[in-house]
Every structure is written in structure tokens, then in C-alpha cells.
Amino acid sequence: MQHLVDTSNFSDAQIVQLLHDAKTFKAQRPPQLLRDKLIITLFFEASTRTRSSFEVAAKRLGAAVVHLDPSRSSTKKGESLEDTFANLCAMDPDGVIIRHEENEAPGILADMQMTSVINAGAGNYAHPTQALLDLFTLMEHFEGNIEGKTIAIVGDIISSRVASSGIRLLRRMGMNVILVAPEPFMPQSDLPQYENLEDVLDKVDVIMSLRAQLERHASPIFDDYNEYARHYCITEERLGDRNILILHPGPVMRNIDISDEILEDPRCKVLTQVKNGVYMRMAILKLLLLDSNN
């Protein structure tokens, strides 16, 4: 039984296999490889892209999907997460996909060894499927070679599980990572750090913009989102004609994170990320629910 709590759960060979399978699934509609599988989704936090993407991925592979709404579950009556999970596992699902506000939640459930656990986002520490779909998008764009390329992660990095997982995976795959944020948004890190976005534009091949989560910070850093945008919004004026790939995990705050014009620019791959998310999650489900059990 294998789990995906973070990308470190996968070997280099497995990541290569995921990239191959995602590319294959994107090129042609796959057979229903998981037609006898049952997956339960358990999202304790809001999700548009990740939950929908997983459900589409599972159904395209033929799996049945059951969604448990925590707001209407016995967790509201005081049942613990572990007991909720154990009761779900008594129904013999082949996997449980969980999003939770606590960093440790997916790992706690995985350690119970009752069914395969897939982390769909936990706290501010890990969002492994987002990191893997971003890797797929980058490998596709750079024709399979990202080693030595430089990515700037811009925005509220300290609050971002996307940044945490992405940094670990992209460094592992040979990319250079630099961080761009005001000091309160910056995590402790040995990576190069900049406060001024303009200082990195001639150094990078890719910018990953993150949503500014001002609500997560106790003391005001900016007066409002418009002030943040004046410093960190990815705009046509800032980019000029530089050939920089633009990514964002969503939801995008238009004209705060990325301008309307850049969202329509061919350098921006936000919707490609969403599309690739389905194929990468198909590959992940195949690996965990089929290949790992053979």
C-alpha cells in the first residue's frame, strides 16, 4: 500500500512514470483502468480545481467516486478525524483523497495503513499533486529538460502549501528556485530572496505567482490588495517582451496577482495547469491504486 502525503513518497523512477503516463493520457482517452475501484473524497477546506480535477480524473479511469461533506458529517458532532477515516475505511474504499487545514492530517491517516491516502492539500506545508502537475506543465513546455532553469515564486510564500511542495520537488528535479516577497511573506529558507520583483525579471525562465492571503496575517502588511498589486502584480508593463512562462495555482485574483492582459497572454499557462492537473491526477491514481498493488 502506497500513499501520497508529499512528493518525497515517490521515487525518481515513479516520477518519471507519472510524467510518462500523464503525457499518454493527454494524448489519447485511456481505457477504464480503475473501473472496479472506489474512491472517497474528504475535503475539509474549499476547493474548485483540486476536487473537480480528482473527480474528473477518477471517472475518466472508470472509478466510482463518493464525496463526504465534512460540514454534514459526524465530525460536526465531535467525531475525531481518525474515527471518521476508520469508519470510511470499513466500507472498503481503494483510496481516500483528503484536504485538511492541519499539516499533519494526511500523514496521520496514512500511518493508520487502512487504505491509500492522497493529500489534496494540507495546511501550509504540502500540496503534492499541484507540485506534480506544475512539473508536468514545465516539462511539457521545456520539452523534457528543466534542469538549470530558474523559477521565481512570487507572493505570499509563507502561507502557501503550493510553494512548499513546489520548492521541494522543483529543486529535486534540478531547477533553481528564487523567492520574491515582502519580508513578512517570506519563509525561513536558504534560497535566494528578493523583495523587489523587478530585480529578478532578467534572471528567470518562469514566474509562479501566488495568491496574496492578507487575511492570514495578523498585522497589516499592505493597506489593501491594490497596494500589494502595485509591487507584485504580474503585468504587461513589468514583463515587456521577456520570454518568461507564467504559472499560478489558482484561484487567481485578477489585477492583484496577475493582470487581465497577462492572463490572456500566450506566456501564461494557468489554464494549461488546470488541464494538465486532470492528466497528472489520473497518473497518480493509476500508480497508487493499480500499479502499486501489482
UniProtKB/Swiss-Prot annotation:
Catalytic activity: carbamoyl phosphate + L-aspartate = N-carbamoyl-L-aspartate + phosphate + H(+)
Class of the enzyme per the UniProt entry, highest EC level: transferase
Keyword Nucleus: no
E.C. code: 2.1.3.2
Keyword Plastid assigned: no
Pfam families, per database record: OTCace (PF00185), OTCace_N (PF02729)
InterPro entries: Asp/Orn_carbamoyltranf_P-bd, Asp/Orn_carbamoylTrfase, Asp/Orn_carbamoylTrfase_sf, Asp_carbamoyltransf, Asp_carbamoyltransf_Asp/Orn-bd
Annotated protein name in UniProt: Aspartate carbamoyltransferase catalytic subunit
Species annotation: Sulfurovum sp. (strain NBC37-1)
